[in-house]
Amino acid sequence: MSRLALMIDLERCTGCKSCEAACKSENALGPLERRNRVIWLGSNPETTCGENSALDFLALSCQHCERPACIRACPVNPKAISKDNETGVVTVNEDACVGCGECVTACPYGAMGYDPNGRHAVKCDLCSDRRSEGNNTTACASVCPTNAITFGLREELLKTSKKHGRGIIDNDPFLL
């Protein structure tokens, strides 16, 4: 199986939110919609003094879980959310989604959003439209100024990370 993934190097992320802007532009998302987001953690060192005045960033998007809680939570039959067995990509069928928000609530990562105009869930699909057009990277990875986001085959990304001595956060029961 050639499972696709994003690898996000948290040591390189500067919190610039270029990935958010690229995703919104690529997917023509409105101001209240999101498929990814950058969360600022900690205190602002410019306004806070002291030992713990660090600001960290967490780039967050769908983890494309092995056992997605969002699929299990979807009350629609057939499910409005599915997982591609070959690529591992979890997608929302916006036409089938009833907009109940159960999947958004069930996501353990808070990685799903909601389109109030279309009344359906939205989430990262690893730029499926771009991939179908032959583009070999995601919008977020293509604009990241620090190359903190890499798109590719999951196993290759894990090898690269290990080769560079990076720690892997890959022990979540939803991801196994």
Feature locations, PLM:
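Non-ligating segments of multi-cofactor redox enzymes
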Residues: 1-176
